């Protein structure tokens, strides 16, 4: 089952996506897409790893080369997040982003978290506009394939396709 969870900054999307994964009794995998650029990023990653360890997630670092991720046949994976992955694809040679369907075929459930950054109403030029268009294409393509699509607003999930996975 493929579930796409969208939301703005601090909307509760990540917490909601994690709660979906925690409902399953299957092995849990966290596909981490953040690239560590500095000490602040490293501290954030360490904090999140510690939080997930208590919840029995196995972390798979995949800021690039998502196509190389190998997961056991049964399990539930949480990919956090498509915004990072899209940026990595745009700004890194040989970037990832095209291979989410391959990852989905490896596990029983895949929950994807993505950013809702299209409501600002501002026009951007150059790289920012290119990034927003790329992320919109990724979100649209995955929403079309997904069994469930929801947007989290103020911590409340609103489903546009499917419903709460059991």
Features from the language model and the residues they span:
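Arginine residue identity/basic-tract feature
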Residues: 28, 44, 49-54, 74, ...
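Portal/gating segments that form or line small-molecule/metal binding sites
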Residues: 46, 50-98, 109
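Conserved P-loop
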Residues: 2-71
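Short secondary-structure boundary segments
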Residues: 8, 81, 114-116
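Residue-level signal for inorganic ion chemistry
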Residues: 17, 48, 78, 115, ...
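Hydrophobic beta-strand segments of well-ordered beta-sheets in folded domains
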Residues: 27-30, 77, 110, 115
């Amino acid at each position: 089952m493929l579930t796409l969870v969208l939301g703005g900054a601090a909307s509760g999307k990540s917490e909601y996506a994690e709660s979906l994964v925690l409902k399953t009794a299957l092995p849990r995998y966290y596909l981490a897409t953040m690239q560590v650029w500095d000490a602040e990023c490293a501290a954030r990653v360490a904090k999140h790893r510690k939080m997930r360890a208590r919840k029995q997630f196995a972390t798979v670092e995949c800021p690039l080369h998502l196509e190389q991720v190998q997961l056991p046949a049964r399990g539930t994976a949480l990919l956090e997040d498509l915004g990072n992955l899209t940026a990595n694809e745009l700004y890194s040679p040989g970037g990832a982003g095209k291979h989410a369907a391959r990852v989905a075929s490896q596990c029983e459930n895949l929950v994807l978290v993505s950013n809702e950054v299209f409501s600002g109403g501002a026009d951007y030029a150059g790289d920012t506009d290119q990034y927003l268009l790329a992320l919109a294409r990724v979100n649209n393509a995955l929403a079309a394939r997904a069994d469930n699509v929801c947007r989290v607003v103020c911590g409340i999930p609103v489903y546009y396709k499917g419903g709460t996975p059991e």
